[in-house]
Amino acid sequence: KKFNDYTKNNLYGLDFAFFLSLLILDNTDNSDYFFYKFNISKKNQKRIKLIKEFYFSKKPPIKFNSQNLWKIFYFNGKEGLVDILNYKIYTSKKLDKNLVNQINFFENKEVPKLSVTGGDLIKNFGIPEGQRVGEKLKEIENVWINNNFKISDKNIKKILES
């Protein structure tokens, strides 16, 4: 395969797990057999499986808009997001400068943290300990994620009252 200038210049900077993903991932179960046959660390297996699930699952493809990239960043971390974007760059015939810019943008970012904890719900809002705290915390987290990682006390109270 012919590489564009970006991929040529950055090919030697790839780590082992990502390089393996470029070699073994496709629509077959080759990666599963590879994991069975060769001793690959669980961390590297997880990274390769993330890329495979993202690109080769039956789900409709996810667009690389800002909100979706932030969600990937939150759920899979910086390394997972960079792997997903790099895989797209290295397997495409043309270089998408937007993807390179996104990698550079997220390199210096920290994963967002939800400021509300279960202890806060129990202490400040009088919710009894138990399963309900987890359910409400999950609802708050979903609203927080869909609202670009911002949530007001008003929204929290509204969720807790429902």
Task: Describe each PLM feature range.
Residues 89-162:
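Charged substrate- and nucleic-acid-binding regions of tRNA-handling and nucleotidyl-transfer enzymes
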Residues 1-92:
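Conserved, hydrophobic alpha-helical core segments of structured domains
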